[in-house]
Amino acid sequence: MASLLYFILFLLFVCISYYFTYYPTNKLQAAVMETDRENAIIIQRNDEIPTRTLDTAIFTDASTVASAQIYLYYNSNIGKIIMSLNGKKHTFNLYDDNDIRTLLPILLLSK
């Protein structure tokens, strides 16, 4: 009878040890795990090809205008716009004036 009690207590100890090892047991761990999940989702979205399609005019040089179809993705967390044109990804930082000057004509001339 005593050995059965020891066995049950041992199983209870194993279950409690498993719980404390693999599950968050305080608010900090829970917050960190939630932030890691959100960051993984953002990273996955940034790696995907954007789905918004625009027909726009691209200035290849000062006198030449070419029609093109671009794909846009906007990441509000880091303030970047990712543009895919002819299979190439271009990243524009919304906090950089040169990138904004490059991006505005593309967006204004798009349908």
Curated annotation (Swiss-Prot):
It is a single-pass membrane protein. It comes from the Viruses. Unglycosylated because produced in viral factories instead of the classic ER -Golgi route. The chain crosses the membrane at residues 1-21. Induction: Expressed in the late phase of the viral replicative cycle. InterPro entries: Poxvirus_G3 (IPR010367). Residues 22-111 are virion surface. GO terms for biological process: fusion of virus membrane with host plasma membrane; symbiont entry into host cell. It is found in: Virion membrane. One of its GO terms (cellular component) is membrane. Keywords: Fusion of virus membrane with host cell membrane, Fusion of virus membrane with host membrane, Late protein, Membrane, Signal-anchor, Transmembrane, Transmembrane helix, Viral envelope protein, Viral penetration into host cytoplasm, Virion, Virus entry into host cell. Pfam families: Chordopox_G3. Interacts with OPG099/L5. Component of the entry fusion complex (EFC) composed of OPG053, OPG076, OPG086, OPG094, OPG095, OPG099, OPG107, OPG143, OPG104, OPG147 and OPG155. Except for OPG095 and OPG053, each of the EFC proteins is required for assembly or stability of the complex. Component of the entry fusion complex (EFC), which consists of 11 proteins. During cell infection, this complex mediates entry of the virion core into the host cytoplasm by a two-step mechanism consisting of lipid mixing of the viral and cellular membranes and subsequent pore formation. Belongs to the orthopoxvirus OPG086 family. This is Entry-fusion complex protein OPG086. It comes from Variola virus (isolate Human/India/Ind3/1967) (VARV). The gene is OPG086.
